[in-house]
Design a protein with these regions (language model features):
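A short N-terminal interaction module
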Residues: 2-113
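SAM-dependent methyltransferase catalytic region
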Residues: 62-90, 94, 98-300
Length: 300
């Protein structure tokens, strides 16, 4: 009598983020970039591919195209494309605050060490961004009323989280879809010097508001400006009730004009996070709140 074959579960096991990180690091090492410029182009091309696949997963109504961005790109091989798709499929199993952080962390991981160091690029885990927003709320921040800015918003860790809190407030829940979109456009803003990181942030906010935009019949206007916060602050006419974020760290050389502008807060070498604090105080409403992730050296 023939034995019946044993039924087996052949569904592949879902990889962990640590396993994907290992593959991303291996991909970076095998990429054979000959210059920092090529490394940056690869980091952006791979991250762009992940975001495009992620958008395809979210855009089930096929209503909106993913926002476009002009960038120097590097052609990806079939393995890199498959890995990008797998990562996007993994992200969609998480909540948006988690994969917003992982998206920024992945982009940072792929960037050259020198670029990260020179630009003070770090991304904020959801536990820290949520904790900082809780502290601001305890001090009186009102996510349904206040105008909020993240002056270094690359990766979207704070803009996405604040937008989610705005949408979760009972007063905002009562609004129509179009009113919710208009509220976000009026009350939430970001500034980011890295054009690609700004695009990631804007696209993540688009994903968060996808259902509202479908119901309203229009897209969210861009809420992220591509600018250097330190340099643009003199011409910034908007004022904010809450300024929150994780500003870049690291010493910076200033030209004479910029040093004069920030002279009130300079003691010895200029540090980026110190300049961001000064810049933020200049555009803060009277009685407003600033909440930043800062190094312990800030405490003296």
């Amino acid at each position: 009598m023939r034995e019946m074959p044993i039924a087996m579960d052949i569904c592949p096991r879902q990889k962990t983020w640590e396993e994907y990180k290992y593959e991303i690091e291996a991909l970076k090492k095998s990429n054979n970039c000959n210059s920092e410029k090529e490394e940056i182009a690869f980091a952006r091309s791979f991250s762009f591919s992940v975001m495009k696949f992620l958008w395809r997963n979210v855009n089930y109504k096929k209503r909106w195209e993913c926002r476009q961005i002009k960038m120097v790109s590097k052609r990806l091989d079939i393995y890199a494309i498959r890995l990008a798709k797998d990562i996007a499929d993994y992200f969609i199993t998480l909540n948006i605050m988690e994969y917003a952080y992982l998206m920024g962390a992945m982009y940072t991981m792929l960037l050259p060490d020198s670029y990260r160091s020179d630009n003070g690029v770090y991304y904020t885990p959801p536990s820290i961004s949520e904790r900082l927003l809780d502290l601001l709320a305890a001090e009186g921040a009102d996510w349904a009323e206040d105008k909020v800015l993240d002056p270094a918003c690359g990766g979207g860790a704070f803009l996405v989280t604040v937008a989610n809190r705005m949408l979760g407030d009972y007063r905002i829940k009562e609004l129509s879809a179009i009113e919710k979109i208009e509220h976000i456009e009026k009350h939430l803003s970001g500034i980011e010097i890295d054009r690609f990181a700004a695009w990631i942030t804007q696209t993540l906010v688009d994903i968060l508001l996808y259902s509202e935009t479908i119901a309203a019949g229009r897209r969210l206007k861009s809420i992220v400006k591509v600018q250097d916060t330190i340099q643009c602050i003199e011409t910034e006419t908007r004022r904010f009730d809450v300024i929150v974020g994780n500003p870049p760290y690291g010493k910076i050389k200033l030209d004479e004009e910029t040093r004069k502008l920030y002279s009130r807060s300079l003691y010895g070498h200029a540090n980026l996070y110190g300049l961001f604090i000064d810049a933020s105080l200049r555009i803060l409403q009277s009685g407003g709140l600033v909440g930043f992730v800062t190094p312990t050296s800030f405490l003296g």
